[in-house]
Structure formats: C-alpha cells, structure tokens
C-alpha cells in the first residue's frame, strides 16, 4: 500500500509511476501484477491538515482490485483502488490514461475525507481517469452507505461508473451526493440504481453545479443528475457547458429519483438536454414527484418527459409543476405519453397540475403529450384521477408556442370520454391566465381550448393586456374513432364529450382586455379532415379582438378649418372598429392628400358624400388611410363617381377592402338605424 501523507508543515506529493511491466510507487512493491498491466496495489491518500492542499499526480496508473470482497456478504468489504481521507483538500493531476477498479462496496476512487477532492488536467500532457465502483459503491465518491461530497472536476476526461445501487459520481448505496462541481473537461457518469451524478439508491443529490465542460450523466433507475432511486434532487445549477442528462425508469433527467421531487433547479446558460425515464419529467419530478422552483434564465434547454412526465415540471401520477420561471434562453419542453397518461410540456405530469408558471422572456416551445396541455395540467393518469389544472400562468414577454393535444394550449389537461366512463374523471380547468406582453401562440386540439380548459374542462379568468399579440386556436377532433368534430373554445372551455357519444363545443368566454394597448387576440377555429394524410387544416371560423377604443375626441369628425381656415361645418368623416365602435384618429393635409391615421391593426374609415365634396372643394384629391400594418390611398373623384351617400374602407391586419357604394349604404343602415 502506497501512502501520500501530509503529516508535517508542508504537504508531500505522492506520484505513482508505471514502468515495464508495472513499476510500483516509491517505497512500495507491486502486489499480484497482472498480465493486462493492472496492479493489485491500492493507494491511500491522507491529508489531515485542513489548511493544506496535498497535490498528487496519477500518470498511467492502473489498479484492479475488483475481485476483492463478497457481494453477498456486506460485512466483507472489498478494497478501494484509490482512497482519499482526512480533513484537508487533495488535488489530483491526471496525466496519461488511468484506470481504477474497486472491490465490492468500495468506490473506484473512494472519498471519505471532509476536504475537497479536485480532479484536474493542468499539465500539457492530456490525462484521463476511468473509475469503476464495486457493488453498492460509486465510481467516484462514497462506498456502501457512504456520501460522495465536496468533489470538483476542472479538466481531463473522467469516466465514472457506479456499481449496482450507487451513483456514477456521488453517493454509494443509501448515500447522498452533495457539493459536486464540474467546471471543465469531459465527464461521463453512469449509474445502476443511483444517479449518474448525485445520490445512490435512496440517496439525495444536492448542491450540484456545472459551469463548463461536456457532461454526460445517465441514471439507470436513478436521475441523470439529482437523486438516486427514491432520493430527492435539489439545488442543481447549470451556468455553462454542454450537459446531457438521462434518467432511468421512473427517474427525472435532472431532478428527483423515483418517487421523489426535483426542486430548486436553475439553468442560466449552456446547452442542456434532459430526458426523463418512463413516468418522469425531463427536468423536475420523478414518478409521483413534483418539480418545484425551476428557473431558466438563459442557454438552450431541451427537456423531454417520459410517458406521463412533463417536459419541465412534474412526474406521472400526480406530480405537479409548481413555481416555474423562464426569463430567457431557448426552451423546448415536450411532455411524454400517448393515448392518455401524459405530461404537459411545462407543468404537471399525468393527473398533476401546473401552477405559478411565469414566462418573462425567451423563446419557449411547449408541447403536451396526448390529452395534456402545452403549458399547464397533465392528462388523466394511468390509474385514473382527474386531469391536472393550469392555474396562475403569467406571460410577460418573449415568444411562446404552446400546443395541447386534448389538453389546452395553455391551461388544463383533458379527460377523454373513456376516462369519464372508466374512472369518473374530470377534465382539467384553466384559470387565472394572464398575458401581459410578448407573442403567444396557444393551440388546443381534440377538444382542448387554445387557452382555458382541456377536454371536459372549464376555462376562466383570462386576461390579455399591454402589447401582447395572442393567437388562440382550437382544432376540431380529427380522431376517426370519435363520431363528431367538436372543438374546444379558442379562449374558454374545452369541448364536452360523454361516454354515450354526445359532444358539445367548448363555450367561448370573453377575456379581460381592458388593459390591452397596442396588442390583439386572433381567434381561429380549424376544421381538419379526418384523413391524417390529407390536405392541411382549413379555417372554419376566424375573428380578431383589439384594444378597446379610448374615449373619442370631443370632435371625432374632420373640420375643414384644418385645411384652409374657411369656416365650415364639421365633416362626417369617422374611424371605427369593424363592429362600429368609435376609434381615435388623426388627420393631416399634405398638399392635395389628406392623411387619416389610426393606431390600430383593424379599423374602418367611412364618411359621407358631403364630406367628399367639401374636401374636393378645398383642394383634397386623395385620402390616405393609415393603420398599423396597412396604407391605402383613395381618389376623391373616383369615390364621388361611384355615387351613393356613404363610402367605407376596411383594414383587417394586412388586408384592405373597399366597400362599394351599395355596401356602404347597407353598412350605414346597419350602423345608424
């Protein structure tokens, strides 16, 4: 056994070297040298000085003691290839290719010290470490029932494989992984019943930070990064690097181990791909666990839930997605599941609600699994229950595309007729949904509302304000197994379906648009063909809502005084919504052109023949009508030549339409009868 010890004023350096066929470290003799070049030696590093750093270099060291101990007798612990002990910090420089294989219940690189272990590759020679733990022990970290804590990796290539029930990097069986930091290098961590990085079986993964490097973390029956099977994953921060995390069955990609929550997860940068195992979220909760306090402020994040799990949020069977905030970055979140038992893109897993979700900025694409919301609640679970609701969802900015599939685009998950018949389930409601800004596309299908309730769910308390640009769409059922083509509301309730085959379209509700300024709501209902391979959906119905008009000016007509200063009566020239509600407008003459400007997307200009004659008399030859996205020029002479006592011109977004004299007369009667 070779020891690098710090037992006096300055810490010493132990530097094992390999020669042909296998030279021992100074002061030690090789034990059972093997034909494959591995030593039977072990290395123990002890630094008992808390204020000293012991520096060790591993250069082409290969140790294999994996045949020691008894995996069936937990009292017979095998040897650790390399063990770090003591109160002080130890820094290991990696040069060349190093391999450590430990016996049963011992970690490949076992750390029992309270100080910090740092693996680095600062020299010019590239270095790597492959560490494999015995059964119940981590690749790097704790042995059986041991914690793996205060571990830092700054460089090199590190491959860590945990033995059965242990983490790749972190805790052994029943041990937690805590205070693990990766700032650089390439790290591949794989577990079996533990987390890739984090806790072993029943152990938590806490205070894990990744600021750089390339990290691949795979949990087999544990989270990719976070808790081992049955362990919570919390206080996980990613600020940079390229991170790929995949959870095993029932475990989150980043977050909780099977049956546990994932909480306090923060991503501020880097590229992150997180995939949940079956029944678990990509980022957040595991099977039955919630995803709480998840914040994304930057980077590129792709999160995919397993069956029943949210992309970001809760796991299956009641896992909620709570207090989720996105402030920037590019986020793609996809809920898992097919034909029910599905999670939301962002929000709840199956039977789980999505609550207190806020998007302030960034580009967000959220797609729910079958009968789940894009943002909000999950579907009915595999064993029944109600679909999840979407509550207290706020969008203040950014670009948000949210698509539900039987659930709302934004709001509640859906309950199919079969769920009602079999389980007595209820659809998920969507309530207290506020959009204050940004560009939002919310699409519901299979009876889910664009914004509001999922299939058989209710929508209420929807507010759109500021400069928000909202497109809310609903698509009629295209399920060949369902005899009707019912639709949810664009904003409001999901459609109602009953086990006896009856269906009712979802009721539209009026969103509160009292605070809307320059934004709008575009409502679209699509009528698809039942053949999946046929032409694209056609629009069945479409309408717009715009900011409520401000109180009209005291004189909302046009006065010839503004032209030539000649006293004339006020001209009958008006701007209004397409429904006839007066809108404020400005007029200005430039030469022979009268410009009429209204700061609205859709508006109608109309006036009398008397107005046209008076304008022509005062030198106006053409009228230029200007709205947000469209400018149209009308000839005064041509309008007069058409005859009729009224004229009208409509702008609807980018489209203009001049009404004929007869249509204008009809409009006059409609508006003023």
Would you name each region that the model predicts?
Residues 1-555:
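A composition-driven surface/loop motif
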Residues 20-26, 32-46, 52-78, 85, ...:
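Long, contiguous ectodomains of secretory-pathway proteins
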């Amino acid at each position: 056994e070779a020891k690098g010890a710090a037992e006096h004023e300055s810490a010493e350096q132990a530097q094992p070297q390999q020669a042909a066929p296998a030279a021992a470290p100074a002061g030690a003799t090789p034990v059972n040298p093997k034909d494959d070049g591995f030593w039977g030696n072990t290395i123990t590093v002890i630094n008992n000085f808390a204020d000293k750093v012991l520096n060790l270099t591993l250069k082409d060291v290969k140790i294999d003691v994996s045949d020691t101990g008894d995996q069936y007798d937990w009292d017979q612990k095998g040897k650790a290839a390399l063990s770090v002990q003591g109160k002080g910090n130890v820094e290991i420089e990696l040069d060349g290719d190093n391999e450590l294989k430990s016996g049963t219940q011992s970690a490949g690189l076992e750390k029992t010290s309270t100080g910090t272990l740092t693996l680095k590759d600062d020299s010019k020679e590239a270095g790597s470490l492959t560490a494999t733990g015995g059964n119940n022990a981590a690749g790097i970290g704790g042995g059986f029932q041991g914690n793996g804590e205060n571990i830092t990796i700054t460089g090199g290539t590190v491959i860590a494989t945990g033995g059965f029930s242990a983490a790749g990097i972190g805790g052994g069986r029943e041990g937690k992984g805590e205070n693990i930091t990766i700032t650089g290098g390439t790290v591949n961590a794989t577990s079996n019943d533990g987390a890739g990085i984090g806790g072993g079986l029943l152990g938590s993964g806490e205070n894990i930070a990744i600021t750089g490097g390339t990290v691949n973390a795979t949990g087999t029956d544990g989270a990719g990064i976070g808790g081992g099977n049955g362990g919570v994953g919390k206080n996980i921060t990613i600020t940079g690097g390229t991170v790929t995390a995949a959870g095993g069955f029932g475990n989150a990609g980043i977050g909780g181990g099977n049956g546990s929550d994932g909480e306090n997860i923060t991503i501020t940068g880097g590229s992150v791909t997180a995939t949940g195992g079956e029944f678990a979220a990509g980022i957040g909760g595991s099977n039955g666990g919630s995803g709480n306090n998840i914040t994304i402020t930057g980077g590129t994040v792709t999160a995919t839930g397993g069956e029943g799990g949210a992309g970001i949020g809760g796991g299956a069977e009641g896992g909620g997605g709570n207090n989720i905030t996105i402030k920037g970055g590019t986020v793609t979140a996809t809920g898992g599941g097919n034909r029910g038992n599905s999670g939301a893109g962002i929000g709840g897993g199956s039977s789980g609600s999505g609550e207190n979700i806020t998007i302030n900025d960034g580009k967000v694409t959220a797609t729910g699994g079958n009968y789940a919301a894009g943002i909000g609640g999950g579907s009915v679970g595999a064993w029944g229950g109600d679909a999840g609701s979407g509550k207290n969802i706020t969008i203040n900015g950014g670009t948000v595309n949210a698509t539900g599939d039987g659930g709302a685009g934004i709001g509640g998950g859906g309950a199919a007729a079969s769920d009602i018949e079999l389980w007595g389930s209820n659809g998920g409601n969507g309530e207290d949904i506020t959009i204050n800004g940004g560009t939002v596309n919310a699409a519901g299908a299979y009876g889910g509302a664009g914004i509001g309730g999922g299939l058989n769910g209710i929508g209420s308390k929807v507010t759109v304000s500021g400069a928000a640009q909202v497109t809310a769409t609903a698509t009629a059922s295209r399920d060949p197994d369902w005899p009707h083509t019912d639709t949810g509301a664009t904003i409001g309730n999901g459609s109602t379906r009953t086990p006896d085959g009856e269906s009712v379209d979802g009721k539209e509700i009026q969103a509160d648009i009292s605070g809307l300024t320059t934004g709008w709501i575009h409502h679209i209902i699509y009528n698809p063909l039942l053949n999946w391979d046929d032409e694209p959906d056609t629009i069945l119905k479409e309408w717009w809502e715009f900011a409520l008009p401000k109180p009209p000016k005291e004189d909302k007509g046009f006065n010839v005084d503004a032209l030539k200063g000649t006293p004339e009566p006020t001209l009958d020239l008006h701007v209004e919504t397409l429904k006839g509600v007066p809108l404020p407008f400005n007029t200005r003459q430039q030469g022979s052109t009268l410009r009429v400007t209204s700061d609205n997307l859709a508006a109608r200009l109309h006036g009398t023949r008397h107005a046209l004659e008076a304008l022509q008399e005062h030198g106006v030859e053409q009228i230029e009508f200007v709205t947000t996205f469209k400018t149209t020029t009308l000839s005064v002479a041509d309008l007069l030549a058409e005859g009729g006592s009224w004229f009208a011109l409509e702008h609807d977004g980018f489209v203009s339409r001049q009404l004929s004299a007869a249509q204008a007369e009809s409009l006059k009667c409609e508006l003023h009868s």
